[in-house]
């Protein structure tokens, strides 16, 4: 199973997180399948590769709580619903 979760980067006392698609059994710092964005909690900046996130969500990837909140602010789930309604028609 694949999850979308945060992977810690940066230096001591200055954490930056990458949003990655990673196998559930991997460690937090383990090998990721693909980098799909980043999150800087100090500057409160985010970048999301929305098409990549949508691809993994459509394939059944589960976002963690924090990644879910970040994606919700970026309105990824609205685009997911739009894509699903288009494919149903």
Curated annotation (Swiss-Prot):
Gene Ontology cellular-component terms listed: chloroplast; mitochondrion; small ribosomal subunit
Main location: plastid
Source species, domain of life: Eukaryota
A biological process from GO: mitochondrial translation
Entry's Gene Ontology molecular function annotations: structural constituent of ribosome
Location(s), subcellular: Plastid, Chloroplast
Keywords associated with the record: Chloroplast, Plastid, Ribonucleoprotein, Ribosomal protein
Pfam families membership: Ribosomal_S16
Protein's UniProt keywords contain Oxidoreductase: no
InterPro entries, per the entry: Ribosomal_bS16, Ribosomal_bS16_CS, Ribosomal_bS16_dom_sf
NCBIfam families membership: S16 (TIGR00002)
Family in the record: Belongs to the bacterial ribosomal protein bS16 family.
HAMAP family according to UniProt: Ribosomal_bS16
Name listed for the protein in its UniProt record: Small ribosomal subunit protein bS16c
Gene from which the chain derives: rps16
